[in-house]
């Protein structure tokens, strides 16, 4: 499960990349972890509507019996998610420059950073929801491709192709759901840094 990613670009560069209004987001680059804010791209869910970049806190408040914030959307038919997924205005793009998965046993873990060489800034398929104090976000996961699966065989984030950004932000759920699929391995790269966890 991906619980750390980097977005090493300032707000104005991200806004240009996603053809979005940067607003007053102060983001100047860095890492995003659960319960930390990160920029996401939203719209009002209608075709042709202007995209906006806004700060959101990573991690939905947990369900009644949960403890930790929910950062990844796995069961797309769960009542916990489906109400949000069906509303295009509550879907978002999560800008990323690389994301991390761990391998190895406790005490001997290695970090693996995944990126897209042809897209220095790419996007996860995300959703957002207004919580009591903060608007929050999470991103969808799917079966891993060959590259990610060699490190983390359970799941990988849903990475969107740029030509699918509008569909994710505006299409009805039946159409948007078809975008939930592993990103092609041949378009990705991985780097092992061997460093201890940042958190």
Annotated model-derived regions:
Residues 1-199:
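Short linear sequence motif anchored by a di-proline
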């Amino acid at each position: 499960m991906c619980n750390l990613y980097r977005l090493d670009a300032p707000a104005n560069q991200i806004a240009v990349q996603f053809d979005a209004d940067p607003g007053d987001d102060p983001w100047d680059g860095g890492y995003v972890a659960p319960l930390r804010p990160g920029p996401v791209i939203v719209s009002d869910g209608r075709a042709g509507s202007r995209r906006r970049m806004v700060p959101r806190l990573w991690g939905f408040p947990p369900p009644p019996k949960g403890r930790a914030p929910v950062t990844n959307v796995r069961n797309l038919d769960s009542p916990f998610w489906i109400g949000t997924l069906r509303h295009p205005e509550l879907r978002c793009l999560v800008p990323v420059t690389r994301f991390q998965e761990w391998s190895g046993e406790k005490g001997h873990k290695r970090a693996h950073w995944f990126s897209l060489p042809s897209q220095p800034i790419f996007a996860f398929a995300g959703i957002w929801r207004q919580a009591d104090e903060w608007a929050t976000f999470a991103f969808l996961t799917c079966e891993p491709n060959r590259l990610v699966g060699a490190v983390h065989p359970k799941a990988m984030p849903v990475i969107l192709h740029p030509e699918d950004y509008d569909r994710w932000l505006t299409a009805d759920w039946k159409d948007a759901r078809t975008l939930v699929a592993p990103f092609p391995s041949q378009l990705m790269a991985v780097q092992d840094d061997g460093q201890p966890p940042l958190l």
